[in-house]
Regions:
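Bacterial Sec-dependent N-terminal signal peptides
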Residues: 4-26
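A compositional/structural signature for long, glycine/proline-rich flexible linkers
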Residues: 19-422
Length: 422
């Protein structure tokens, strides 16, 4: 197994650069937008990604120095991958980054300063005595068997300093510099090469259980390709017909209210994301602060098609219930919407309940569940349930675990309608 280790060492370095560093936007990829309707594998619509990939075997004597400013975002991280396999080999989350001298980490304590950081990525060929001289407390070591390294930046809910949505989190992308591992002199960074990250797509397939009336949620296994190891997901999928609605209710994970509460939080962020199983792209999403939800109380999520003949009545009922204080949230899915390939996205929907930095020790953490593999030659997820109390969210987590039922639209609109419980 390939491992990446973090060590914390500091000293001074007075070497001057030998090369002019290019614009960092030219070093990193163009923004891989979660809401761009291009990425597969059900990305979160409120995330942005950038990758820098290079052939390590062509630069055996080069380490990387990544210098940047902490962005304004709910969550920020660096992830490192073996680009030949898509396997995660390490990374560092926002709150783990030691800031530069004179700066503060705004993901640890509230800070209005322009705070900066430096991260080194060092190959296995770099001597320990030279590593000890690097002037940073953030050292990422990459094993010798990695031939092509992909570094990925993730931002969730990036804004500018005023809190307005911003593609880059209100700061420039980090600068990547090359460092000669023998002299520690600054040299030109390795040339970025094409990465497999943009080629990742999820597998499209049909399931008999999509026609079932009940819709259970399972813990997703760790992603095979370029996963965010600091995120956990519950997933479900079903076929929503034009004359029906899908409803699921649960208590969302409680979240910190301030940066100072990040340490020890049950999670940093949650969202509900809907994607098309026809192409594994995401199209509709809602995140914690936008959702009609209250801490410690059940929130209800309703999905119906835009093509439902009683859509206006469904919308009116949801609004009326919200006015009465109900925590209802409505998704209107357009099954005729065309994807980037000109094909309709269809009416078989995947649902992802995402938690970032979930607390594994919390009683109701989704990470305490047993993962259930997606459909494969051995069957569908529901066929693989051998321990319901650990694999089905509503059994493992009680009211904190979602479970869905489909209803005829006519029944949902009755005055005496009541949501079923399991």
């Amino acid at each position: 197994t390939t491992l990446l280790f973090m060590s914390f060492i500091g000293c001074s370095d007075n070497d001057q650069p030998d090369e002019t560093i290019i614009d960092p936007k030219e070093q990193w990829s163009a923004t891989l937008r979660g809401d761009g309707e291009i990425l597969g594998a059900y990305p979160d619509l409120f995330s942005n990604y950038w990758e820098y990939t290079y052939n390590m075997n062509e630069y055996p004597d080069v380490a990387l120095r990544i210098e940047g400013q902490f962005p304004h975002a709910r969550y920020f991280s660096f992830s490192l991958y073996d680009d030949e396999t898509g396997s995660a080999i390490g990374g560092i989350n926002d709150h783990e980054i030691i800031p530069d001298e004179g700066s503060e980490n705004p993901f640890v304590s509230t800070s209005e300063k322009d705070n900066r950081f430096t991260i080194y990525v060092v190959p296995a060929s770099m001597d320990e005595t030279q590593i000890a001289k690097l002037p940073s407390e953030n050292i990422c070591r990459v094993n010798a068997d990695i031939k092509r390294l992909a570094i990925c930046i993730r931002h969730y809910l990036g804004t500018n300093a005023n809190g307005d949505k911003d593609e880059y989190g209100g700061v420039a992308l980090p600068v990547i510099k090359g460092i000669d591992i023998h002299s520690l002199k600054e040299i030109q960074a390795p040339e970025r090469t094409e990465s497999n990250i943009e080629k990742v797509t999820g597998q499209s397939f049909s399931q008999k259980s999509d026609e079932n009336r009940d819709v259970p949620f399972f813990l997703a296994p760790k992603g095979r390709y370029y996963p965010n190891n600091s995120t956990a997901y519950l997933y479900a999928r079903t076929h929503v017909h034009a004359d029906s609605v899908l409803i699921f209710s649960f208590i969302p994970v409680p979240l910190p209210r301030t940066v100072e509460e990040y340490e020890g939080a049950k999670a940093r962020y949650w969202s509900i994301c809907l994607g098309a199983t026809s192409n594994t792209r995401s199209y509709y999403s809602i995140y914690d602060k936008e959702a009609n939800a209250k801490e410690g109380e059940k929130a209800t999520f309703i999905i119906c098609l835009k093509q439902n003949s009683r859509l206006a009545e469904i919308q009116a009922k949801v609004e009326a219930q919200k006015q009465l204080g109900a925590h209802w949230n409505l998704f209107v899915w357009d099954s005729e919407k065309q994807d980037v390939d000109g094909k309709p996205i269809g009416d078989v929907i995947a649902i992802m309940y995402r938690n970032i930095l979930p607390d594994k020790d919390w009683e109701y953490s989704i990470t305490r569940m047993t993962p259930t593999e997606y459909k494969d030659d051995e069957g569908e997820p529901i066929d693989k349930v051998t321990d319901p109390d650990k694999q089905l969210a509503h059994k493992a987590l009680g009211d904190y675990g979602p479970y869905g039922f489909k209803y005829a639209a006519n029944d949902f609109l009755r005055d005496d309608f009541e949501e079923e419980t399991y």
